[in-house]
Structure formats: structure tokens, C-alpha cells
């Protein structure tokens, strides 16, 4: 008799939570609703996660691992400043588009009314991404001998705000307005402006 593959219950709970965030935009996810979606009791949920905040932390850990590991690959493999910036922004937008429910965590929508430390972790994640972008922009001077007329920190903040805005539009439109829509044309314009500065 063949054994059915063992389900990793923690991962299954997180997948269901992400799915509920996608299919129930604007609604608060309760542990009772999540337990029903997973097909277990609330007590069973708490055997895997001591609190709902820990469930959201599990999603945030997935976000951090996925984005930061890929960001490090971009930093290692690509040396051109503009291409690096483009790839970092594209990474954020594609990740958001492929994970609509998780986009609600990224923009803070799903964290309203939840533990403050969850929003703080997302803030820290975006601060790390902004630091990477700032580093990319600062390395332009070292690599090419030419910098920008505007402080790199200001430019990094502008680029990250662009990506965050696209993610927010995606969430606000209930996942209809794709973050990557018109990205190539928008990036061409942004790049032209950056190279002028």
C-alpha cells in the first residue's frame, strides 16, 4: 500500500493564510476562519503556531528569505548600476504579483490591528532593500567614476517608493492592476531621469 505524502502542517497553514489574504481582500483573518480553511481545529493551529502573530511572522520570514536571497544574487551576478536597480525593482513587483495575498502583508494592509512587531519587521525589510539600492547607486561612482547630482539616499528612497506604490495599487485594486504592468516603459523613463541627475 502506497503512503500518501506527509503534509507539512505548518507550511499548509501558511499557504492557507496567504490564500485567504488573496481571496478575502479587506477582511480580517480570524483563527476560526483559518482553522476552517485548513480543516483543523483552532487548537490544532495553536499546536503549530502559539499565536496568530507567529503565523504572520512565518509569512514574513518567507518574504524575507525569498526577496533578500534573490537580491543577494542580483548583487553578486550583475555589476551594471542601472541593470541592478531595474532587477531589484522588478524582483519586488514580480514577487508581489505572484503572491497576491502576501502583497497585503508587504503593504501593511493585512497587518492592521495585528501585533506592532509585525509592521516593524516589514519596515525593517524595506529598510534593508532601500540600503541595498543605496549601495548600488553609491557603487556607480566607484565603478564608473561618475556619481549622481542628487544624494544616493534620496534616489534610493524614490526608487523604493515607486515599487511600494505599485504594490499598493495592486492591493487597492483587489489584485487587478498588476504591479509589472507598464514596468518596462516606466523603467526606461526612470532610468533616463537617473542618468541625467
UniProtKB/Swiss-Prot annotation:
Residues 7-67 form the HTH tetR-type domain. The keyword Nucleotide-binding does not apply. Residues 30-49 bind DNA. Residues 110-130 form a coiled coil. GO terms for molecular function: sequence-specific DNA binding. It comes from the Bacteria. Its main location: cytoplasm. Keywords: Cell cycle, Cell division, Coiled coil, Cytoplasm, DNA-binding. One of its GO terms (biological process) is negative regulation of division septum assembly. The keyword Cytoplasm applies. GO terms for cellular component: bacterial nucleoid; cytoplasm. It is found in: Cytoplasm, Nucleoid. Required for nucleoid occlusion (NO) phenomenon, which prevents Z-ring formation and cell division over the nucleoid. Acts as a DNA-associated cell division inhibitor that binds simultaneously chromosomal DNA and FtsZ, and disrupts the assembly of FtsZ polymers. SlmA-DNA-binding sequences (SBS) are dispersed on non-Ter regions of the chromosome, preventing FtsZ polymerization at these regions. Homodimer. Interacts with FtsZ. Belongs to the nucleoid occlusion factor SlmA family. This is Nucleoid occlusion factor SlmA.
Amino acid at each position: 500500500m502506497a503512503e500518501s505524502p506527509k503534509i507539512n502542517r505548518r507550511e499548509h497553514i501558511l499557504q492557507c493564510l496567504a490564500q485567504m489574504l488573496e481571496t478575502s481582500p479587506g477582511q480580517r483573518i480570524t483563527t476560526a476562519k483559518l482553522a476552517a480553511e485548513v480543516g483543523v481545529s483552532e487548537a490544532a493551529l495553536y499546536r503549530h503556531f502559539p499565536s496568530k502573530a507567529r503565523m504572520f511572522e512565518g509569512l514574513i520570514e518567507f518574504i524575507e528569505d525569498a526577496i533578500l536571497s534573490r537580491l543577494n544574487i542580483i548583487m553578486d551576478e550583475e555589476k551594471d548600476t542601472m541593470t541592478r536597480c531595474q532587477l531589484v525593482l522588478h524582483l519586488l513587483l514580480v514577487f508581489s504579483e505572484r503572491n497576491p495575498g502576501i502583497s497585503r502583508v508587504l503593504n501593511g494592509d493585512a497587518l492592521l490591528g495585528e501585533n506592532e512587531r509585525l509592521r516593524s519587521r516589514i519596515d525593517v525589510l524595506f529598510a534593508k532593500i532601500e540600503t541595498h539600492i543605496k549601495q548600488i547607486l553609491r557603487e556607480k561612482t566607484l565603478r564608473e567614476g561618475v556619481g549622481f547630482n542628487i544624494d544616493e539616499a534620496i534616489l534610493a528612497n524614490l526608487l523604493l517608493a515607486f515599487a511600494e506604490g505599485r504594490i499598493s495599487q495592486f492591493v487597492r485594486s483587489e489584485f487587478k492592476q498588476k504591479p509589472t504592468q507598464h514596468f518596462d516603459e516606466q523603467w526606461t523613463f526612470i532610468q533616463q531621469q537617473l542618468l541625467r541627475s
